[in-house]
From Swiss-Prot:
GO terms for cellular component: small ribosomal subunit. HAMAP family: Ribosomal_bS20 (MF_00500). Belongs to the bacterial ribosomal protein bS20 family. This is Small ribosomal subunit protein bS20. Gene3D superfamilies: Ribosomal protein S20 (1.20.58.110). NCBIfam families: S20 (TIGR00029). One of its GO terms (biological process) is translation. Pfam families: Ribosomal_S20p (PF01649). Binds directly to 16S ribosomal RNA. Keywords: Ribonucleoprotein, Ribosomal protein, RNA-binding, rRNA-binding. InterPro entries: Ribosomal_bS20, Ribosomal_bS20_sf.
């Protein structure tokens, strides 16, 4: 347990930051799962839309130091490569 008031404050801030970072990390994972779901359905148009939203959230995570830049780039690259390999769904 912290004895100094500054150490107590630092401990409180750590708890607060940890909750915020977990929330942001969970949101990023959720958006990635949405893209993967659209890819599994084979819906290229919706997958592209979901990827653009996920890409935005992933890069926001990089800016907030939730994930590293290379990790984000790798995730985006792999998702976009999977979408690119899909055939265009011509059903109307």
């Amino acid at each position: 347990m912290a004895n100094h008031s500054s150490a107590k404050k630092a401990a409180r801030q750590t708890v607060k930051r940890t909750l915020i970072n977990k929330k942001r990390s969970s949101a990023i994972k959720t958006f990635i799962k949405k893209v993967v779901h659209e890819i599994s359905l084979g819906n290229k148009e919706n997958a592209n839309i979901a990827l653009s939203v996920a890409q935005s959230k992933i890069m926001q995570g990089v800016k907030k130091n939730i994930i590293k830049l290379n990790t984000a780039s790798r995730k985006i690259s792999r998702l976009s490569r999977q979408i690119k390999s899909l055939k265009v769904n011509n059903t109307l």
